[in-house]
């Protein structure tokens, strides 16, 4: 006779344990009846069949209740419940939750979350519970095991059971044309630029509550250009009244005509009266300046998610050549340069993204070239804006449709082709979910790094890699079943207000909207994969680099195949891996130990990036990474690390951007350099721990974590902190003319 333990182990039945458990219960109520205890023990023994522990305890309870010893039965039940609670209290999940609640286990997996705060602790504790439910009770066994074994990683696993989606480009035209409603009221359409800027922040905040990733505008200049006109008309009307001394009826006629014709703010209809026009423009510029500053301050102070998070916001701009659109872009860049707060510190959000395009802003004779120069000025001081390439070979823009213009959100997400009628339009679309393949895990098993073989087993690698790709496809489809089954009532702001496409078609489920979104197949650790397979990374050897490129190309091909099979939008994605860089590394160390240049550092290298420790020039880094950028159409980014003093040479900075976009076809570029602020006097430059002005060591050291900034790099998780300290400045290895 055997007993199945709670942990699944099978052991021989021990009658003494049954007898002793009954005697303990009897002793606790001073009613010791050894004969009854032996009788019950013998009856259980005579069943002579395999049982689990709970079945045996149920039999003891039932037999005690059937006897005259009801008090003993009650004592046994209490004892059993106490033991159950003790076991649960000592379980890994409960211990994890208790640690979260105490604020002692600070992981900083997301630099935008304050894990020390009450709401941050609550968020992380809830997250631990939801993750365990998803892995142990919801997912298919093979998918759960692949996650636990470290082959794949489900991002934001705590949202799996809820069916939330990741990120979205909001349809601002829709909500600003019709207004929008929230749970406690409704909002009229804005009638001025200042009101529109306030409502952008409100809409971003409300949308962020019904998803777990970033919220963005794919063309803020186009979204807000009409409100520049509305504000100008008001200021011009005031000028007519106070300078022109016109009566109300005359002013009403002038403005009515302007509105009917939707006249531009530079139309000669207005410029004819120089004094009134100058007044109106001056007041408009002042309003734009204050409104943009207000937007930036709001987006850095509206803590609307658990853990004191602000909405993860991104704004794209720079393409609208109308006077109104240009003023929107200028206002945003001026606000970025000005900074926030009493010390004019660099704003963390929004991630501002300048939409680079030849014929629009790339070259000196382009109409918006002055905005590019202003963007470079902002970049040199604030790290933002990033630059996105409208001329990228995979952009597929329609020059007559701004909704198709190249844009990114969050750390790097791009939204590609929609098979369900929207084509390359991005507005009202986003990403449903990313799942990342841990490439070094497969490579360790088939490479030379463990010493089991002298030559990599490439066939074995490809077989396993394709097996994992198929598993990722299955995992996406399983999660989508949960997502599409949700009611629109789960996200009323999004579905009632039409921030997402085809929300009006969603009645009992949200499939009609979510089908337009993408399913990202991500990857991490190309460098460590190559090292594990061949003993070199892709920055060190051309042949190794070609193999690495074939792996990423295969993900892209598989995404296309999965799109065809399922009539959904799969994409290849260069994963940001903020917390995953450390989580995946720890899993590999647990399984394989320390392997030089594979698991020997405290992080894995993001996507296909050249390892941060490699001493390469600016242009070599760009040239190495550029071929990879063709394939992750779901999003990628290229970084360059620079000295802060280098940023004073704006022409050199512009040359880097032009070379990356015009010569190398890189889609998305960001330049990194240190920004330090003395929090006692506000002095800003690279301070190296001490302020030269006031001597304070109360220094904020701002760095980029993945695609976004955070207030101080010491708030990153341990993996990202280690990476920051090992980042090589590529300027040190570059000869500049």
Q: Regions from the language model: what does each represent?
A:
Residues 86, 93-515, 536-537, 541-703:
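Conserved catalytic cores of very large enzyme subunits
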Residues 64-71, 228, 534, 710:
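Short alpha-helix boundary/capping elements
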Residues 503, 515, 519-522, 721:
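Core of folded catalytic or high-affinity ligand/protein-binding domains
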Residues 43-48, 64, 547-561, 723-735:
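Short, mixed-charge aromatic SLiMs
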Residues 689-737:
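Long insertion/accessory domains within large nucleic-acid-processing enzymes
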Residues 519-532, 553:
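Contiguous, well-ordered alpha-helical segments that form the cores/surfaces of helical PPI scaffolds
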Residues 1-100, 105, 722-728:
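Charged, amphipathic alpha-helical regulatory modules used
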């Amino acid at each position: 006779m055997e007993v199945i333990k709670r942990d699944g182990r099978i052991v021989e039945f021990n009658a003494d344990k049954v007898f002793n458990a009954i005697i303990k219960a009897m002793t606790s109520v001073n009613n010791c009846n050894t004969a009854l205890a032996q009788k019950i023990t013998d009856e259980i023994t005579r069943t002579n069949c395999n049982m689990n522990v709970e079945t045996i305890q149920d039999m003891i309870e039932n037999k005690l209740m059937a006897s005259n010893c009801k008090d003993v039965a009650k004592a046994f039940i209490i004892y059993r419940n106490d033991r159950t609670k003790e076991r649960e209290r000592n379980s890994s999940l409960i211990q994890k939750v208790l640690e979260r609640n105490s604020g002692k286990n600070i992981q900083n997996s997301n630099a935008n979350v304050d894990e020390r705060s009450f709401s941050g602790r609550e968020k992380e504790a809830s997250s631990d519970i939801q993750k365990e439910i998803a892995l142990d009770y919801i997912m298919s066994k093979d998918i759960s095991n692949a996650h636990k074994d470290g082959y794949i990683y489900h991002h934001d696993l705590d949202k799996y059971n809820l069916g939330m989606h990741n990120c979205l480009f909001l349809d601002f035209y829709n909500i600003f044309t019709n207004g929008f409603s929230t749970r406690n009221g409704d909002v009229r359409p804005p009638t001025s630029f200042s009101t529109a800027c306030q409502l952008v922040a409100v809409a971003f905040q409300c949308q962020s509550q019904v998803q777990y990733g970033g919220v963005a505008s794919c063309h803020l200049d186009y979204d807000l250009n009409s409100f520049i006109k509305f504000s100008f008309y008001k200021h011009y009307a005031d000028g007519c009244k106070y300078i022109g001394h016109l009566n109300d009826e005359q002013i009403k006629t002038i403005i009515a005509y302007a509105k009917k014709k939707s006249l531009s703010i530079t139309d000669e209809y207005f410029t004819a009266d120089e004094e009134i026009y100058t007044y109106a423009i001056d007041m408009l510029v002042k309003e734009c300046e204050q409104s943009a500053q207000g937007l930036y301050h709001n987006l850095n102070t509206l803590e609307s998610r658990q853990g004191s998070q602000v909405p993860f916001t991104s704004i794209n701009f720079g393409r609208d050549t109308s006077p109104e659109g240009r003023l929107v872009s200028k206002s945003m860049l001026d606000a970025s340069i000005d900074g926030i707060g009493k010390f004019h510190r660099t704003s963390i959000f929004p991630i501002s993204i300048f939409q680079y395009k030849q014929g629009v802003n790339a070259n000196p004779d382009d109409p918006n070239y002055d905005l590019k120069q202003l963007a470079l000025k902002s970049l040199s001081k604030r790290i933002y804006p990033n630059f996105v390439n409208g001329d990228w070979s995979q952009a597929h823009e329609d020059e007559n449709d701004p909704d198709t213009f190249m844009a990114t959100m969050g750390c790097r997400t791009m939204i590609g082709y929609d098979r369900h009628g929207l084509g390359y339009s991005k507005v009202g679309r986003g990403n449903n979910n990313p799942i990342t393949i841990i490439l070094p895990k497969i490579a360790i098993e088939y490479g030379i790094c463990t010493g089991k073989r002298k030559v990599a087993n490439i066939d074995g690698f490809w077989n396993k890699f394709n097996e994992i790709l198929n598993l990722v496809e299955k995992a996406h489809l399983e999660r989508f079943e949960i997502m599409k089954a949700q009611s629109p009532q789960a996200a009323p702001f999004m579905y009632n207000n039409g921030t997402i496409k085809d929300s009006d078609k969603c009645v009992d489920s949200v499939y009609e909207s979510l089908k337009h979104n993408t399913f990202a197949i991500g990857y991490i650790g190309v460098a460590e994969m190559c090292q594990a397979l061949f003993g070199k990374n892709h920055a060190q050897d051309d042949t190794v680099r070609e193999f690495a490129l074939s792996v990423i190309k295969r993900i892209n091909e598989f995404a296309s195949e999965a799109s065809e099979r399922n009539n959904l939008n799969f994409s290849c994605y260069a994963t940001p891996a903020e917390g995953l860089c450390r989580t995946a590394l720890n899993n590999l160390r647990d399984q394989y130990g320390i392997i030089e240049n594979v698991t020997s550092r405290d992080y894995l290298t993001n996507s296909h990036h050249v390892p941060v420790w490699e001493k390469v020039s600016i242009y070599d880094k760009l040239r190495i990474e550029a071929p990879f950028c063709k394939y992750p159409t779901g999003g990628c980014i290229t970084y360059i690390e620079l000295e802060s003093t280098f940023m004073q040479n704006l022409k050199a900075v512009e040359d880097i951007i032009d070379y990356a976009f015009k010569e190398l076809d890189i889609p998305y570029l960001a330049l990194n350099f240190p920004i330090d602020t003395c929090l006692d006097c506000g002095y800003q430059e690279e301070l190296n721990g001490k302020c030269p002005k006031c001597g304070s060591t109360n220094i904020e050291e701002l760095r980029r974590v993945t695609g976004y900034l955070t207030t101080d790099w010491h708030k990153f998780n341990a993996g990202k902190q280690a990476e920051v300290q090992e980042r090589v400045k590529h300027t040190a290895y570059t000869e500049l003319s």
